[in-house]
Amino acid sequence: DHFNTGVDTDTELTEIPEPGIYGGIQYKTGAGGQLALDLVYSNRQAGNEIEIRNMDFSRYALLMVNEGKIAVETTVTFRNCKFDAVTTGREDARISYVFEDCTLRNFQGSNATFTRCRLGGSSGDALNPYRNVTLRDCYIADLAHPDSGDTVHSDGVQIFGYPSLTAENISFDNCRFEVPAIPGGGSYVNACLMIAPEKSGAK
């Protein structure tokens, strides 16, 4: 629950106010003004076991780029970090992401493991996994937010897949979902876990 997941509020986080080099890792401006993390060109010196700790990325959405060009098995571990949205590639790649004790508004992608993480905090889905995503001891909540549109359709997790991909190896172990209804109007929250690969023609 909220007492034992997410970032440690007693630990000071280093805020990422703009693209630049922080903790020896370079972040560039990506598509749509997102913060881009590139391990092929900009951070070749970082090696294949990378740890990023006590960082606050919440000012930007974080986008992982050039994953398909990574030549050796690489692991990026985020410990006690705070995020807005995080997007990784959909396909299998020689990279995996580990999130421990992190807080995220949304994750969309593949090849990631979450432990003691808290996800949610907007009127959108908290998690959109494609392949190879594991959650352990995580908390998904805080989705009942008003929206400026006509309706709000928020799922704790929505697995909608992607054409040419098979949604698989997605698992949850000891996770708590709190997905309350949004009162009034046409706003509603749909499900703790929605599985709808037919939406994109996936399997």
Q: Where do the protein language model's features map onto the residues?
A:
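Extracellular beta-strand/beta-solenoid scaffold signature
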Residues: 9-10, 32-42, 59-69, 80-94, ...
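Post-signal peptide N-terminal regions of Sec-secreted extracellular proteins
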Residues: 3-10, 144-147, 166, 181
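All-beta strand scaffolds that present successive hydrophobic residues in beta-strands
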Residues: 21-22, 50-52, 73-78, 94-99, ...
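Extracellular "leader-to-stem" segments immediately downstream of a signal peptide or signal-anchor
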Residues: 1-51
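Short helix-loop boundary/capping segments
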Residues: 163-165, 170, 178
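Extracellular structured ligand-interaction cores
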Residues: 111-114, 124, 132, 154, ...
